Amino acid sequence: MDLLGYVKKQTGEFLENMPKSIRKKKGQFFTSVETAIFMANMFDISNCKDEVSVLDPGAGTGILTIAFVDRLFAEKSNTSVKITCYETDADVLPVLQKNLAYLKNAFNDRVSYRIIEEDYILSQSNDFQENLLAAKNPEKYDYVIGNPPYLRITRDNPAAIAMPKVVHGAPNLYFLFASMSLFNLKDNAEMVYIIPRSWTSGAYFKAFREYFLNVGKIEGIHLFVSRDKVFSAEQVLQETMIIRMKKTAEKPESVLITSTNSSSDFEDVSELRVPYDAVVSGEELYVYLPTNEADINVIKKINMYHSTMPDEGLKMKTGIVVDFRQWEELRKEPGENTLPLFYSQHIRDGRVNHQPSGKEYDWIIDEKPGLIQKNKNYVFIKRFTAKEERRRLQCGVYSPSDFEEYEYIGTQNKINFVDKTDGGEMDAQTTYGIYALLNSTLFDMY
């Protein structure tokens, strides 16, 4: 049996005997052979040395490492490899040991390996923090390949405490692993990781992005068009990407972005070469994922704007009322001391009305100041739109003159609204200007 066929068989038998519910609690989602081969082929091995070191954190059954070594030896006949795998799961360790032994037997002296049965994060926390207990010369690697655990943890979890410089908001093991792997690389060395897309934007991941994109630079990204077909055997509904990072401060001119429909059709790959500044942009270091030239042009045009809403004294806020929590303050019909409560269903054709929304409660009493807001100029935006809808960004102008009998109104938290940061009121020109921007095709595509 060929090398990868053997590993696939061993992995399949393990998955059959280990319930998915147990693996999910551990954050384990196993990589297919097809994905492992694709990831192995993403590395640049043109300047490969005679002896290289490979790290696989959270190795599982070892399929990623073995796919990489299989490719390496097929192209570099004189290279030998030293493998380091981290794995703590007692259930999968026997499979990993068997697979690495099979690899060693296939290539004899060209392969040496060790399995470290320690926590990947905690065992290196002093080194990562560079404190007094850190090793003088922590081990570094030529290549890192990984499919890290996807598991939300609390901020007081030991792993989160061990890596404070990358934690802000709600931590997840996957980006702690990615940060540590970048730390583990030699200068100018590469890592290939399969991770969720969630880190590419948002405040929770800002600290991670600052570390990840300053210590390293993106060389390549692979996207899956269909999110339910990445870990198809695992039935995971998670938007996922594969990323190739180089540990360097030098920014490349461009990033190669490839895409396929799923993890089983790597024969049909679309390629796009994108300027680096169109991928990583702004003070927040958001990562944009264009898949065609039109997407690139949209990003370039948006980046031409010289100011943001906060720069102009404006802020996007979320509707105040969480209806299922504040139902005691809600009313089905207007009455004494009631105010109109606005839902996303009230945003229609660029305006905001208060026709029946289809919700049970369209009114709120005015007894709690924290649940109501001034009746003044706003732009309302739907927070969520159905996938089949033509426009992702749907908004409407809220005009206080349409509801002039009320001093205050209520907004349900499925809408966002644009307001002045200082609590004042936008003039009509600003209100309609913001609406025109948000309602444009450019912003909708963005």
Regions found by a protein language model. Give the residues of each.
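Conserved class I S-adenosyl-L-methionine
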Residues: 50-60
